[in-house]
């Protein structure tokens, strides 16, 4: 083994001087920072109010603390050994951190963790500038003596930190001329200190890529509340470090003994999740020692272990990536608001001329510790800060401690007063009462607030606690004081307005720490408490979702078959069809017979299903990549995996947001234009859902105003996709194809009949259509419904942008568009059909260069103008009609395994142009489209914007194929398409241009500056209805379909010779 290697800094495994770094230094010597991690003290707060042995009683259980120290310098992360069951650990470890050329900064970070098998607790951190360690008043020193450093918390954890660490530092250079020997002493001799250390250190400082003194000092100096402002500790990286260390716990450590393996903690003993802003809760998974020189591990073994560690981390990220409905034993969630303190004793200041009291409150329960912000110079502070945490079964008998401290810059903090009492003393009188008719399990009837009977709690107003230190406050008056501190986490809400009836207000009589103030002052802590049982929270969660998804005002407390499937699909259920069928079967109702399920029935079925199946891990009912309320991802293997607890804690900050963000109907312009909400909604709508579980929600952005609105999928489209996807065998698949084809043809004939004229008025009323732009503005003058459907517009109703410039291509229709610069990008981002190819799409025209074509997809909704126009100037060279299926062109189907464009009925028009060569204009029919009609013939010289044809009733799509070396799409369309967002276009608007000319520039219009009528018209075009009245958006088309007309299909029809073979799409490509 050669001595020219580098220390391993990739994933925190035991350090070695073996060659493990790919980018080897060209210098002869490598500079290292030697960190002597000696010991720590007082890592968790202790009660010092008693005397003798009582003074050692910890507010957090110090007996279960397993401290480990993690050191991070740029990309290098290393950890010490883990010490078991001690609040005063002695590590006596030495960590070597390489100081590499072109490092980012000189910021050195220490973090202390209470590490258990299944979780970790944050105990504080320390930040130092490496330059300040060795340069004192301009004098350089290469070694420092051991020194005590006080730990602080960062703003993310916002925890009460009391610990300190004893550490020393030294700069050393590894001599590469010597080889390794077998003993540790020989290996230590390779690290030498000479005159080159100072020059090497200066060289390293000058090579830093981010050397700004201000930026480093800003990160290492706590704010006025004693918190580090930025979160610099990456939990996933630390997870990799300590997990790798845990695999090597059998190794010996210089200066210490090997660790004995201990059984992993029970999963019920894990610290439960809390999303309060002053949170110190979490979990780590490792137990290992630091081994700088590990001779037993070869370079090859080290590489393999790092690869395995990365694979484990990757699997860990995938497994714990999303919020789910977890099967856990949880009693409920406790909400406590620290309101205020009064009558605190006036501690004298340093000069003893006045009092000095900057109070704050520390709350400790089990392994969870919370801290409020401190209030300056007051004896009656008002906090209005809320915390929340889960109550696990084994914690039901635990005590909760409240400690009031005086912030002191010189002597850490002074104890002022405290109280410790069983948690059940508080929760017994603050447990939310189940609704009437269900005394054991809660079934709330209010989606955004707690609906209770009487006083809303399980105890009467005449009942009071037996503990004299706890007094119930009646007729509480709310405080009007509100503030938001800059230093707090953005999730922290201070002084929020809340319904006082939801919480039980209590006054706690505190015990003074200083005996001389007893009898003179009687400090009290005012709190508000509420305990929600887990069953009640889960049922409340069901009802919130059900009420927000209900779209029919006449059935406010019930759902039909389609609505319930749509809700489950949107939330990520992978077997919604089977689940809803099971509910109907259990209740003896017909799923397709129009029977409705009440909310109570659905909730009962949900509870039964969850209790029977989720615990066994058979199915996931919900899966959120981000929390829909706080928009935060999960960051570690904590037990915040449970969406119910996370929902309760997030919603407790502001219960009004639940209705806004869990709404499954239309999105208001104000909500949709918020970037974070749009991204979250896209993820909830499209993210990682598989076939049969895709969402019914489509986001569309208006090109002129920029507003983003949600479009609802039609019920008949959903029905068609469901039927098609559930066809398991060849005969059943063909049966469904026949059904869809018959449905489209018969519906087309129906709307061509004179009797269909009566449907025009209801269609106009439903979609709120404005006929001012039409040539015929009187609906009674249309002979049939289809005559009205493909109505013509008045001349000049659609402006052709840059009409005289033949190098500008315009939109062929009023549509929702996505565009792609290559076929490969289209198949990666949008078209997921397994058999989709361009030769198949244009029916085996092998003369075209497939890979060199751009693709534009222009989808027409039923409320759109259904005539299509030429996007270019040219001559119609050929027209080809291809018979096929009638699959829906909805994005839900396009992004499935179904090859919609390659199998649907379509007409291909080849237009020969001067600037773009031959372009392919493909009109694709869809479900409920009776036919495609062209108004121009072969040889016709057509102008840009001139009518080319129209679709009869239904949704439809136009595809454009243009050679990519002769054409570029407009940048705004490409950007939206890459994000999965459709753009609303009008006939004549520019969609792209020749590479030798500039993109057409248009003036954008502010939505707020439009008059009211234009705003409503735009919303109706985008959504297909009136945004203000979402309950009327049931579905007009669905009311016009008589399913009995399409269900009588003879078995012999399934094997009709005229029907294409099941494998026809594959054979056509040969």
Swiss-Prot record:
Its cofactor is pyruvate; Ca(2+). The modification Pyruvic acid (Ser) is found at residue 956. GO terms for cellular component: endosome membrane; Golgi membrane; Golgi stack. Pfam families: C2, PS_Dcarbxylase. One of its GO terms (molecular function) is phosphatidylserine decarboxylase activity. Coiled coil: none annotated. The record marks 955-956 as: Cleavage (non-hydrolytic). GO terms for biological process: filamentous growth of a population of unicellular organisms in response to biotic stimulus; filamentous growth of a population of unicellular organisms in response to chemical stimulus; filamentous growth of a population of unicellular organisms in response to starvation; phosphatidylcholine biosynthetic process; phosphatidylethanolamine biosynthetic process; phosphatidylserine biosynthetic process; protein autoprocessing. Keywords: Calcium, Decarboxylase, Endosome, Golgi apparatus, Lipid biosynthesis, Lipid metabolism, Lyase, Membrane, Metal-binding, Phospholipid biosynthesis, Phospholipid metabolism, Pyruvate, Repeat, Zymogen. Residues 440-451 have a biased composition (Low complexity). Transmembrane segments: none annotated. The keyword Lipid biosynthesis applies. Its EC number is 4.1.1.65. The active site is at 814 (charge relay system), 869 (charge relay system), 956 (charge relay system), 956 (schiff-base intermediate with substrate). SMART domains: C2. Residues 1-23, 432-468 are annotated as: Disordered. It is found in: Golgi apparatus membrane; Endosome membrane. It catalyses: a 1,2-diacyl-sn-glycero-3-phospho-L-serine + H(+) = a 1,2-diacyl-sn-glycero-3-phosphoethanolamine + CO2. Binds 1 pyruvoyl group covalently per subunit. Is synthesized initially as an inactive proenzyme. Formation of the active enzyme involves a self-maturation process in which the active site pyruvoyl group is generated from an internal serine residue via an autocatalytic post-translational modification. Two non-identical subunits are generated from the proenzyme in this reaction, and the pyruvate is formed at the N-terminus of the alpha chain, which is derived from the carboxyl end of the proenzyme. Ca(2+) binds at residues 408, 411, 414. The C2 domains have an essential, but non-catalytic function. They may facilitate interaction with PstB2 and are required for lipid transport function. Heterodimer of a large membrane-associated beta subunit and a small pyruvoyl-containing alpha subunit. Interacts with pstB2. This interaction may be a means to structurally tether the donor membrane (ER) harboring PstB2 to acceptor membranes (Golgi/endosomes) harboring PSD2 during PtdSer transport to the site of PtdEtn synthesis. Belongs to the phosphatidylserine decarboxylase family. PSD-B subfamily. Eukaryotic type II sub-subfamily. This is Phosphatidylserine decarboxylase proenzyme 2. It comes from Candida albicans (strain SC5314 / ATCC MYA-2876) (Yeast).
